[in-house]
Amino acid sequence: MASLRDIKAKITSTKKTSQITKAMEMVSASKLNRAEQNAKSFVPYMEKIQEVVASIAQGSKGINHPMLNARPVKRTGYIVITSDRGLAGGYNSNVLRTVSNVIRERHNMDSNQYSIIVLGRLGRDYLKRRGFNIIDEVVGLSDHPSFTDIKDLASRAIAMFADGAYDELYIYYNHYVSKISQEVTENKILPLTDVASDKPTTAYEFEPSEEEILKVLLPQYAESLVYGALLDGKASEHAARMTAMKSATDNAMEVIDSLTLSFNRARQAAITQEITEIVGGAAALE
């Protein structure tokens, strides 16, 4: 049985750990509130730009733009959103496991058939160690990234599609459902074959021509899809870390309760032993 000193040291150490995890839980909760607001605030912009693009695509005939047209797929691009820091439960492992399985099944790890653009240090390190074909990366993004932070990468990804580096582009990230639930999600970014909507669209008059507007608007729309996924993923990251730290704090408190019970029992046994020895010694003197 552990000594009273050992048990007390474990209690002290566990209490310190619980204080750290509780603080991290509170920090993540604060970051989550802002990340949720950022993600929600971006939705109206994304919906409006999609509405305009859909209006052009549905109302105009004969428009030919490479970002709207599917072509034979010889190579596929993947954008993978992960985090720079861990301690977030299954946030990173879930999306990385999904992407790894998809690439093995679709491409048999043939680097001539796929390319990966990865966001986040943990995702980059994981994929590099396992020999995946990474062609671009971004690390060190803030907890609340601006559009400027991601615009260059999104522009490069779209330019590579236009240049034929790959024939389709998917994005993988954790979609924020609630504070306790996040889902690994796959969205097709390019080509924009599904941009048209069944919903009634507003009639617009375009000046200059629809083709000229699409040259500017389609890249912006594709970039907004990437940025929207990043904001969604950031909310999921903070939620996952908050949940993980709450679980760690709860587990620490259970350990403290168990250790305290063991400490009290050991102390009681020690006191009983001392009393027994005193009584035994007194009896021997009689």
From Swiss-Prot:
List, alphabetically, the GO terms of the cellular component aspect. plasma membrane; proton-transporting ATP synthase complex
Q: Where in the cell is it found?
A: Cell membrane
- Membrane-topology annotation of the record: Peripheral membrane protein
- One annotated GO molecular function: proton-transporting ATP synthase activity, rotational mechanism
Provide the alphabetized UniProt keywords. ATP synthesis, Cell membrane, CF(1), Hydrogen ion transport, Ion transport, Membrane, Transport
List the GO biological process terms: proton motive force-driven plasma membrane ATP synthesis
Signal sequence segment: none
Task: Name the predominant localization.
Answer: membrane
Say yes or no: keyword Transport present. yes
Cross-referenced CDD domains, in alphabetical order? F1-ATPase_gamma
Q: Which SUPFAM superfamilies match?
A: ATP synthase (F1-ATPase), gamma subunit
Instruction: Tell me one Pfam family matched here.
Output: ATP-synt
In which family does this protein belong, per the annotation? Belongs to the ATPase gamma chain family.
The function of this protein is: Produces ATP from ADP in the presence of a proton gradient across the membrane. The gamma chain is believed to be important in regulating ATPase activity and the flow of protons through the CF(0) complex.
Q: What assembly does the database describe for this protein?
A: F-type ATPases have 2 components, CF(1) - the catalytic core - and CF(0) - the membrane proton channel. CF(1) has five subunits: alpha(3), beta(3), gamma(1), delta(1), epsilon(1). CF(0) has three main subunits: a, b and c.
Q: What is this protein called?
A: ATP synthase gamma chain
Provenance organism: Bacillus cereus (strain G9842)
